[in-house]
Regions:
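Transmembrane alpha-helical segments of multi-pass transport proteins
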Residues: 108, 160, 371-375, 425-479
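Alpha-helical transmembrane segments of multi-pass membrane proteins
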Residues: 59, 63, 96-100, 104, ...
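Transmembrane helical elements of multi-pass membrane transporters/channels
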Residues: 16-32, 160, 181-196, 200, ...
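Hydrophobic alpha-helical transmembrane segments
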Residues: 121-125, 154-202, 218, 222, ...
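Interhelical loop/hinge segments that connect adjacent transmembrane helices in multipass membrane
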Residues: 1-13, 151, 155, 178-182, ...
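Membrane-water interface segments that mark the loop-to-transmembrane alpha-helix transition
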Residues: 11, 15-28, 52-53, 58, ...
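Signature of the first transmembrane helix
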Residues: 9-69, 99, 103, 107-110, ...
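Specific pore-lining/lateral-gate transmembrane helices of multi-pass inner-membrane transport
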Residues: 75-93, 255-370
Length: 479
């Protein structure tokens, strides 16, 4: 590949990354704005039930898919059409089975259902029905992107996001009834499931074979270690929320979960960029070009850091003002939790899970994540008991740093590439330093000039000062 071809390919990847980023930004913006409406329509107890419901769904999604949809990034680009169809059919069948099992676990019929979920038991079959369909239809969140049909991915994502936001917000506004909201969420997931079936039928069909034991065995052997490792990783980020749900009232848990929404901002940048780069990284690994694969990962992470660090810095400086403006003063204690989270979210700029997957390091990742999860839960519990609501986030933050240290050293051992050469550390450090400078300057000016002002003028002045310092030296080029 000559220099001109490489440049064109790089530009195409960047455009694809930003296209996916725009779609995911829209989706996450709606998910971000929806609670803004709900806190003004629902009382604190009902809003706590809504957040608890999504925590339960998120925990199911950490384990039930077992990374089967994401692993298609590995299998589909290197397979012919009949084999691709087989992989897709097997993945769909697997998700349907794990979805049904998950539905049983969160059902009131389960005698071992966690006590923290008792507030949801009164909604009967609505919760398990939603869970079963949500797990099964999650394949549509991956498949068009894996097959590089970005416009179709955009249509599917935007359609479901709009339906969910409009139906739930409308139901809350008109009725303030969580039971009605549950029925509307069920309608949304039925739309998502229909889109998945239509996509598979249009591009792959339903022809036989639907299942081959040998092929499925290879698929599950490749996927299971990564799925379990990913599940442990996601459970680490949710464990502190379960601690908060167990130790504190639904109102306090709702405040804690509002702070956790910040992680969605991180996922916008990480997921969109990595999903755009992943097919090309997979092809490079298959061709044996490990150095180029690592360079592509480093470029993706530098792109994420350039945009993510300033967002985290601004939120760190003005957390309480943001909560008052967006979620009302009733949930202002989320501000302290946000600051604790930001200390950990910054390290997520260095995304290495895709590299571990392509290097087939699933068993190691699983073991590491089990160890880190076992350490994070007691830390969160101790922090919650002795330090209050913000202390409950300590476990997941500590776990993030330990995880990155372990994974970077493992990649160095397997690839022969030292840690200091795996990422564009100097670039990331420069963005972080400018973020720290802009954060400190914006905070000092606002607290000096508008100490007693309302949230909006404080945020406006802070944003102007922050942007004036950070943007000229870091955002001149985005690609």
């Amino acid at each position: 590949m000559n220099a001109a071809t490489k440049a064109i390919a790089a530009q195409g990847l960047a455009r694809r990354a930003f296209s996916l980023g725009a779609v995911k930004a829209f989706d996450n913006a709606l998910q971000f704005l929806l609670p803004v409406v709900l806190v003004r329509c629902l009382d604190a107890h009902t809003f706590g039930e809504y957040r608890l419901f999504w925590l339960a769904v998120g925990t199911v999604m950490a384990l039930a898919p077992l990374c089967m949809p994401g692993a298609l990034y590995y299998f589909l680009p290197r397979s012919d059409a009949p084999t691709r169809r087989l992989y897709i059919h097997q993945t769909l069948a697997f998700l349907a089975c794990t979805g049904l099992l998950s539905a049983l676990i969160v059902s009131p019929l389960n005698p071992w259902m966690p006590a923290a979920l008792d507030p949801l038991a009164k909604y009967g079959a609505l919760v398990p029905a939603f869970v079963a369909l949500w797990v099964t239809s999650s394949l549509i969140d991956f498949l068009p992107t894996i097959e590089e049909r970005i416009p179709l991915q955009a249509c599917a994502t935007i359609s479901v996001a709009l339906a969910r936001a409009l139906l739930v917000a409308g139901g809350a506004w008109l009725t303030a009834d969580m039971g009605i909201i549950m029925w509307l969420l069920l309608a949304t997931v039925l739309l998502k499931f229909a889109l998945l079936l239509a996509y598979i039928g249009r591009f792959h069909g339903w022809g036989r074979p639907w299942f081959k034991a040998a092929v499925f065995g290879g698929q599950i052997r490749y996927t299971a270690p990564f799925g379990l490792a990913s599940g442990c990783y996601m459970l680490r980020s949710q464990a502190d929320q379960w601690v908060a749900a167990t130790l504190f009232s639904l109102h306090s848990f709702a405040s804690f979960s509002i702070a956790a929404i910040l992680s969605q901002v991180v996922n916008i940048f990480r997921a969109s960029v990595i999903e755009a780069f992943m097919p090309s990284m997979s092809r490079l690994e298959a061709a044996g070009d490990l150095k180029s694969m690592m360079e592509m990962n480093a470029r993706a992470n530098a792109m994420v850091g350039r945009l993510l660090f300033p967002i985290l810095g601004f939120v760190f400086a003005f957390a309480e003002d943001l909560v008052r403006l967006i979620y009302t003063a009733s949930y202002v204690n989320a501000g302290a939790v946000m600051r604790v989270y930001i200390a950990g979210l910054a390290v997520l700029v260095v995304e290495v899970s895709t590299v571990m997957q392509l290097l087939r390091q699933g068993p190691f990742a699983l073991g590491a994540n089990v160890v880190v999860l076992a350490l994070s839960v007691p830390l969160s519990w101790y922090g919650g008991v002795h330090l209050g609501l913000a202390g409950a986030a300590a476990g997941s933050v500590s776990a993030l740093y330990l995880d990155r240290a372990i994974m970077l050293n493992r990649i160095a051992a397997v690839s022969g590439l030292p840690v200091h050469r795996q990422q564009h550390w100097a670039t990331l450090g420069r963005h972080l330093a400018w973020t720290a400078l802009a954060t400190a300057a914006a905070w000092a000016c606002v607290h000096g000039l508008l100490a007693e002002a309302n949230a909006l003028p404080r945020l406006a002045l802070g944003a102007i000062i922050f942007g004036a310092i950070y943007a000229p030296f870091n955002l001149r080029r985005l690609v």
